Amino acid sequence: MYTADSHGRVWLDEDSFLAPFGHFQKDYDFVINYLRDSSVASRTYFDGFDENVLLQLYGFYLQQGHGWIGFHKKERASFHILETASFVPLVYAVHGGISKKLWGKGSDLCANFIKWFVFEEKDGIKLEGNIFKPNPSLVAYYKRNGMTKDCEIKGRVSVDGKIHSLVIYSMSKEDYLGKPKEEVKEKKKKKRKSKKKKRS
């Protein structure tokens, strides 16, 4: 469904594309400037979790996961990081940020690519999204793109001294494909058998 061009860009529509993250210093500058926007910072940070901690985590996620920088009309407008939350089974957690330039249709185009990459390109079984600090906008974004509340871990986050839960939203491969779980398992078995035959 998605194919990168000779420059590694994955075009989402005529105005927007994703490129591998980190080839240019401006990619990192975009992330820092995005996070320092007061409206973003107020929804992101909490007790013991500041910009320095978050950037260190992003660096770790990129080392063992995947990352893209999003462009809209030749300007950086989003960043997307997939943390490998589990290697066996393969589960990814999505992180990132989307500027106002991509709100609406543009953000959904990015989400569709992320889901395709996780479930079809990498054959992952689950995509997760964490909500540490209460964030209705992020909840709405997850729901709009097919993710549902998976679980709630109480007593994990402190915001101005008030204790909140860590909430995890997720989408399974079955949800993504719109197929029963057993049918998806059977498809994976056939795929593995096909790979073994090619090797032999």
Q: Predicted regions span which residues?
A:
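Acyl-donor (CoA/ACP) binding surface of acyl/acetyltransferases
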Residues: 1-30, 34-35, 65-200
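Conserved GNAT-fold acetyl-CoA-binding loop/helix
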Residues: 36-57
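Generic hydrophobic alpha-helical segments
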Residues: 57-58, 114
